[in-house]
Amino acid sequence: MSLFDHSVSELHKKLNNKEISVTDLVEESYKRIADVEDNVKAFLTLDEENARAKAKELDAKIGAEDNGLLFGMPIGVKDNIVTNGLRTTCASKMLANFDPIYDATVVQKLKAADTITIGKLNMDEFAMGSSNENSGFYATKNPWNLDYVPGGSSGGSAAAVAAGEVLFSLGSDTGGSIRQPAAYCGVVGLKPTYGRVSRYGLVAFASSLDQIGPITRTVEDNAYLLQAISGLDRMDATSANVEVGNYLAGLTGDVKGLRIAVPKEYLGEGVGEEARESVLAALKVLEGMGATWEEVSLPHSKYALATYYLLSSSEASANLSRFDGVRYGVRSDNVNNLMDLYKNTRSEGFGDEVKRRIMLGTFALSSGYYDAYYKKAQQVRTLIKNDFENVFANYDVIIGPTTPTPAFKVGEKVDDPMTMYANDILTIPVNLAGVPAISVPCGFGANNMPLGLQIIGKHFDEATIYRVAHAFEQATDYHTKKASL
């Protein structure tokens, strides 16, 4: 049995009882990485020397009253979150040797909570992708079956947790990039409300959509991690000044009287039978605990995919214009003049998917098309947000599948961008509306790959999401299932 089969609270008891040390936890992580990483490929950079030194430092503090909330816990960090002195690449050749000179706010908070960073995790390049096949270095594999993708863009973050390489990890979610890989890898992933967690130090993909969040084995551990990283940050103008409650205190298991909305669009065309049946089975579990559910409509969700790709690509084309070979990152050697520098650096440094989205975004923002595409997409985004607000006027949470199907095979969709993009049809509306949502394991497909249940909440009501997710988790045994890697 791995130490990482235990929860944060259980590991803290073991530490305080001197049954284990922080060094034991760190060594457990690196031993597991040594055993499986050649197959999973979840990490891009390891930080062994610093992690072991930090473990020794914390071992001397075991039992102290001022220890952090996550004292001694090993964590992996997605490689688009900057870490002072630890390479941050965004899984792109453009930033292959980028060494940040500051920590992201979430990294500062993790350090204050006494976590230990094991390393930086693989991802789709600049967070653009749904399978982790767009990494500029190598593709991460799904620990449940190495022939399948782990999802994306936080594929390394989900795979590392599912493989038992770390206790938990941080990912980022722009259109489903925490929840979708969490579903594919059979773990728990939360996209917080936009503004709940600081984005300072997150390399931007689409600034109005990006949000950092936790990936864990259990709902309780997820609440621990969100507790540690949430809160107002004056370094981030989009950070919200909204009180952070006690997420752990709300894990009561009580859902009696809960009003659940189930959008008909989330169980209709394009959603596989396995995903549909797993959600209906989950609703029966919650009904048995005293919750009620009704079918509702989110009528503008059918426009979400087009809206998202217009807006996110437009923002990406602006955000990624800073990578020009002048200030930092890769610089092309094939340069005769300034135009060569820009053109060749970006052509050589960016992968195909990133180039595709930059071109799409540049087109949407160009003169003559701005009103027809970008401005219209913003208007539709408002309609989508209004749909959620209308439903939440009468219901506590919205529930549906996280993904239309279980994970697909490596290489199956990489040459068909539209089919790949459609994997996010159930997660994208949440980002457009800015509301929080969690994915928890809820079953398996015929291919024995995990399925996820998506629970969506009102703005800044992560507490209710956690309460429902925890109640479902404790009433089922899906969270106890492990990849047999």
Swiss-Prot record:
Its EC number is 6.3.5.7. The active site is at K78 (charge relay system), S153 (charge relay system), S177 (acyl-ester intermediate). Coiled coil: none annotated. It is an enzyme of class 6 (ligase). SUPFAM superfamilies: Amidase signature (AS) enzymes. It catalyses: L-glutamyl-tRNA(Gln) + L-glutamine + ATP + H2O = L-glutaminyl-tRNA(Gln) + L-glutamate + ADP + phosphate + H(+). Disulfide bonds: none annotated. It comes from the Bacteria. One of its GO terms (biological process) is translation. GO terms for molecular function: ATP binding; glutaminyl-tRNA synthase (glutamine-hydrolyzing) activity. The keyword Protein biosynthesis applies. InterPro entries: Amidase, Amidase_CS, Amidase_dom, AS_sf, GatA. Keywords: ATP-binding, Ligase, Nucleotide-binding, Protein biosynthesis. One of its GO terms (cellular component) is glutamyl-tRNA(Gln) amidotransferase complex. Heterotrimer of A, B and C subunits. Allows the formation of correctly charged Gln-tRNA(Gln) through the transamidation of misacylated Glu-tRNA(Gln) in organisms which lack glutaminyl-tRNA synthetase. The reaction takes place in the presence of glutamine and ATP through an activated gamma-phospho-Glu-tRNA(Gln). Belongs to the amidase family. GatA subfamily. This is Glutamyl-tRNA(Gln) amidotransferase subunit A. The gene is gatA.
